[in-house]
UniProtKB/Swiss-Prot annotation:
This is Large ribosomal subunit protein uL13. PANTHER family: LARGE RIBOSOMAL SUBUNIT PROTEIN UL13M (PTHR11545:SF2), RIBOSOMAL PROTEIN L13 (PTHR11545). It comes from Sulfurimonas denitrificans (strain ATCC 33889 / DSM 1251). GO terms for molecular function: mRNA binding; structural constituent of ribosome. InterPro entries: Ribosomal_uL13, Ribosomal_uL13_bac-type, Ribosomal_uL13_sf. It comes from the Bacteria. Gene3D superfamilies: Ribosomal protein L13. This protein is one of the early assembly proteins of the 50S ribosomal subunit, although it is not seen to bind rRNA by itself. It is important during the early stages of 50S assembly. One of its GO terms (cellular component) is cytosolic large ribosomal subunit. The gene is rplM. Pfam families: Ribosomal_L13.
Amino acid sequence: MKFTKIATPEQIDQKWVLIDAEGKTFGRIITEVATLLRGKNKPCFTPNIDCGDYVVVVNASKAKFNGLGKIANKEYFSYSGYFGSVKSTKMTELLEKNPEKLYKLATRGMLPKTKLGAKMIKKLKIYASAEHPHSAQLAK
């Protein structure tokens, strides 16, 4: 009889991965990022342990968007809890002003809604241009 091996935090090797978003489709980038952050591409994947990699996304503002007007119609809502305080932001506005936030919101929707998911999203580094301060980590 075979048993499933459960990985321990000491056995997990977390690497740094660089993704260039220029010319790629937004949804496919986010799917790849969520898979890497979660660690589902590794043979030692364990759902209750953070075994994902650190992900650096560059050229975030140069990604392609497909779909029938999704970028123009999609809205993100924020609500503080007070009456009448629902704020909505269109996807186009978010892409122009703060593409980093757009990527974080989309990726967060694909990760677990737990403390582990919050820990995973902290390992995502997004930059609108090609420059980033993580060249030392990526060189390893």
